[in-house]
A protein has these predicted regions:
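Short beta-strand/loop motif that positions the catalytic acidic residue
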Residues: 108-110, 115-121
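Short alpha-helix in the alpha/beta-hydrolase fold that links the catalytic acid
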Residues: 102, 111, 125-134
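Alpha/beta-hydrolase active-site loop signature
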Residues: 11-15, 77, 148
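Hydrolase active-site cap/lid region
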Residues: 55-105, 111, 156
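Acidic catalytic loop of the alpha/beta-hydrolase fold
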Residues: 119-124, 149-150
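Conserved alpha/beta-hydrolase "nucleophile elbow" surrounding the catalytic nucleophile
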Residues: 46-55, 118
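Catalytic histidine-centered segment of alpha/beta-hydrolase-like enzymes
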Residues: 147-159
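Membrane-embedded segments
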Residues: 1-40, 53-56, 62
Length: 169
């Protein structure tokens, strides 16, 4: 679709991948995939796309790698902020296995950033994306009314914006 090759990672513990899953390993896996892509494509041809847990990884990669654009679907501000939403009375940042401070990477991203998020996301509250959008002045937040965590691809608004972005020079 739109003449793009799509390269994806199965993080350890997801899909058919095995092995230990840690935040640094996930960052390293993304960097390795980026290096492989750069061997074949120019930086101006690479779009870094992350979904859900992968949005923090994608943001970190985009903060240290040149690319054409960054697209994040159902992003979170940070895992700590997300955990505080669910367990607001506990010191969750001390207990968290991952932190993925997505917001901290946004200030270092030079490429255009587009966020896709549904207003009825039952996993990552929409307010996380809205807060994240404020971390970089050029962020475009595409709001999918009544969209949930795993159904944004069913929305015509999602496809219209995605297709328009993929056709940009």
């Amino acid at each position: 679709r739109n003449n793009y090759e799509v390269w994806m990672i199965d993080y350890p513990g997801f899909g058919k991948s095995t092995g230990k899953r840690t935040e640094p390993i996930m960052y390293d896996d993304a960097a390795t995939l980026y290096k492989m892509a750069r061997a074949k494509f120019s930086k101006d041809s690479i779009i870094i796309y992350g979904k859900s847990i992968g949005t923090g990884v994608a943001a970190q990669l985009a903060s240290i790698s040149d690319c054409k654009r960054v697209m994040l679907e159902t992003p979170y501000y940070s895992i700590d902020a997300l955990m505080k939403h669910y367990a607001f009375m506990y010191p969750v940042s001390w207990l968290a296995k991952y932190h993925f401070p997505t917001y901290s990477y946004f200030k270092k991203i030079d490429a255009p950033i587009t966020l896709f998020h549904g207003t009825n996301d039952e996993v990552i509250p929409f307010k996380q994306a809205r807060k994240l959008a404020g971390e970089n002045p050029g962020v475009e937040l595409v709001t999918i009314e009544k969209g949930k965590h795993n159904n944004l691809n069913e929305s015509p608004v999602f496809h219209q914006h995605l297709d328009a972005l993929l056709q940009l020079p």
